[in-house]
Amino acid sequence: MSSILSADDLNDFISPGAVCIKPIKVDKTTENAEIEIGAQGQALEVGIDGTQKELEPAQLSLSDCLACSGCITSAESVLVALQSHTQLLDELKKEAELPSGEKRIFVCSVSHQARASFAAAFGVSVEVADAKLHSLLLDTLGFDYVVGMGVGREISLIHSAQEVEKSTQKPVMAASCPGWVCYVEKTHPHVIPYLSSVKSPQQICGSLLKKVICDTRRVKPSQVYHVSVMPCFDKKLEASRDEFSVEEAGQEEKIRDVDCVITTKEVVQLLTEKDMSFGGLPEIDKSRLYTSVPETWPAERDWANHVGSSSGGYLHHVLTALRLRHDPLETRTRVDASMGKNQDVMEYSVIDTETGETVASAAQVYGFRNIQNLVRKLKPSRGKGKVVSARKSTKTVSAALNPSTYSYIEVMACPGGCINGGGQVGAPEGVAAREWKDETEKMYNSIPSEAVSEEVVDWATKVWGPHDEDKLVTAHYQEVEKVDQGLASTW
C-alpha cells in the first residue's frame, strides 16, 4: 500500500470492512499436507512425503473491486495504490531496457485541478507549474506527449447539456465522480437511472488519445501507454472499469484507454524517491510548452479553463444551455443562488423576470454526508414510481431540497468538490483545510477561460467516426450484486 494513502487523506472516510469478501479460487490438494513459512518468508505446502510446493499469494485487482459489493468508495482506497506512481516507474524502467523498435509511446494527460494544486503547493503561477511538469514528463521521464484535459472536458460538457435538454426524467445527476458512481452501483441501485451517461473528461481523453496516436503513428493500442494526473484516488477505479478498454488481437487482457492514474501528491512522492523536488525542476522552453501534443490534436483548446465550479463547470454549462433555450439574449432572465445548510449544498434557479416563473433549476451537492441526504429523497415511495417528497422547511435549501424539481445535480463525493480531492497536495502545517482549498481554487480560477466550442466536438467526430460516437462519449452503469459473505472465502 502506498505510504501516502491513509484514512486522514480521505474526506468523509468510511471505514473498510474487517475482511475482503471477494471469493478467491483455492486449488486444494487431495493429500494430507501442512502449511509452513519458509526461511525467506514464503508460504510452503509440505506433503507427508516431505515434498514442498510454494503457494501463490492471493491477488486482487482494481477490476475485482469494481465487481464486488463488499466495500464501497473510501474502503477501496486501500487497494487503489496497486495502480500508482511505482507502477509507472516500473513501466518506464522496463521501457528503457527495450530495443528502440519495440518501445511504446508514452503520453500523459493532466487535469486542471492537479495543475492548480502544484501551483498552490509550490508558490508559483499555474503557467510556471505547467512548465516544470512538462520538463519532468518530457525531459526527465521521457514521455512523448503531454496534453491537458480541456478537449475531453469540452466534449463532456457539450454532451451533458444535450443529454439534459433531451431528458424526460428529472434529475440528471453528474457521473464524472467515480467515488459517487461506485457508491450508487453498490448501495443505492435505485439511483442508477438518474446518472448521466456521459463519460468523464479523463475517459474521453483516453479514448481519443489512443485513437489519434494509433492513426497518426500507425501503431496498436497496446503500443501506447497513457498516464493521467488527477486530483482523486478514485479516478484509478474509473480507469479500471472493463467498458473503458478495448480488445486487441494477440493480447490476453483488454487494453485500457487510461493505463495508469497517478494523483498530484504521487507526482511529488515520485520526485522525492528520485531525489528531486518540484521547485528544483527547470522550466521547459516556451516553444515546447502546451505544444508537445500528438499530430492533429487541438492544442489551442487543451489547456484552457471553463467557467463554473472547480469540479469541471458541469452545472454552470448545463444551466446556461437551459437558460439560452428560454432566453437566447439573456435579457429577461436572472439566475438566483441559495446556499443550503453548508457551503457544499447550493441551489441555482433561472427566473423569468417578466413572469416570475422558474424556468429551470439545478443543484450542487458535494460530500458524502450531503449525498446521503440526497439519496434518501430519491427513494421511490411505496406503491408509486415517484421519489420521496422533501419535508417542508423555510430555513435551508437542503432541508427543502426536492431532487425531482431539478433538471441537473452536480454531485461530487469530496467536500469542496474535485479541487479538494484526496489526491491533491495537502495543506502546509498551520494552514486550515478550508483556507488551503480556497487557495488552490484561486489558482484554478487563474487559468485563462474560453467559451465551450462545438468545434472540438466536430473534430472528435471526424477522428472517431460519426457512426461510433456513442462509444466515445457514453458510459453504462449497473447494480453490483451483493455477495453473501457467509458463502465467500475470507482471508
Curated annotation (Swiss-Prot):
SS bond partners: none
UniProt binding sites for [4Fe-4S] cluster 2: 177, 232, 414, 418
Top-level taxon of the source organism: Eukaryota
Positions of [4Fe-4S] cluster 1 binding: 20, 65, 68, 71
Gene Ontology BP annotations: iron-sulfur cluster assembly
Keyword hit for Acyltransferase: no
Pfam families documented for this protein: Fe_hyd_lg_C
Function text: Component of the cytosolic Fe/S protein assembly machinery. Required for maturation of extramitochondrial Fe/S proteins. May play a role in the transfer of pre-assembled Fe/S clusters to target apoproteins.
Family (UniProt): Belongs to the NARF family.
Name this protein carries in UniProt: Cytosolic Fe-S cluster assembly factor NAR1
